[in-house]
């Protein structure tokens, strides 16, 4: 029997967790760009030392949200405040379930009156589309699917980020003039090679930079102009391998599992979702195993989004989050892994037997949603969610969510690397044995220059 929707699919399997852990899908892919332009070490070096161009035109989906009720719907779904969300502003948009667990996060752009754009992974876009289509709102939505799910090779928009210490020098050269002053997550319009571009003030590398986007027809001239402008400043183009690792330095967790697999209030949503969509195909990987899929859910505080939760409006999940607000929360941290333990784990690749799970470079992520067990003296204290190597710091790092008593920098923990029982049936998993790797709880973001950019008096708080 073919399942018509996600709810039917979940009812057809003995275990939701087993279904997700054995899904035949690897990590998120980054189509449209080479794996490497020079090499991933050089490209990582660029975002800390010169400047880089991230080509984001292919791997993220976009949802246009337009109409008189667009703001009303978005405010109803997001934990964020919308009191000051004027045209030409953007924000990290975080919707939750009625039980207060995160569905995902995307960037929300306010492009014009009654016109918005959501950019990121599918779960949030699906959630917004469902409510737009079923809630009786006076509005429209239109999905522009990511390139991996297209056959025409075209998108509605190109999207380029110029980041790093010399990012604004490159922007000035491409514009032919000094860029206008712009606050963090604010938008402006500018002209490059005779075409109008929209620009968002952003800073993934801890330095002020711009994210530029516009009609797909302008992809080539804008891209060429940025590359030419960057030659003097050592601009690196970033390929898919290095791009997948930049979250380790910036401290953003890309991979919360959408918390929609349980709950009677969400049954109609699961019946709306297709069986073969993102939620029905997503893969979980790692050493953390629980029979209850809700143990894989995150709250906003777990992901470092507690400061975004504002109780100044009515939104789905508000009552649950109000109950949680004063509780002890888990904390997002970086784990700096023990060099010798990592080296010993990698060295098992030269053994005929008892090999560890392969650690790829620079990103060791092998599923869409990584969950590795983190312990102290054998007791579970959290999960690791993103794993990889930064050449800039000469360190293997993970982004983790840790119980408050053990989240203080300097705390020694142990990460269990690899899956139990020799591994699941995911195509990215080979037979292996689990290995313990020691780590030290460290700040997030791990890189000092990125961490300093979040200070109250940093460039993020000023028009620069």
Which ranges hold each PLM region?
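Conserved, structured C-terminal
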Residues: 1-35, 112-464
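Acidic, proline/glycine-enriched N-terminal capping motif
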Residues: 1-93, 101-103, 332
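Short amphipathic beta-strand starts and helix->beta connectors
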Residues: 43-49, 95-105, 191-200, 381-384
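Generic hydrophobic, aliphatic-rich segments that mediate packing or membrane embedding
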Residues: 61, 69-74, 89-91, 102-107, ...
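Internal amphipathic helical hairpin motif
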Residues: 68-102, 165-195
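Short, charge-rich binding segments
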Residues: 84-86, 95-101, 106-112, 134, ...
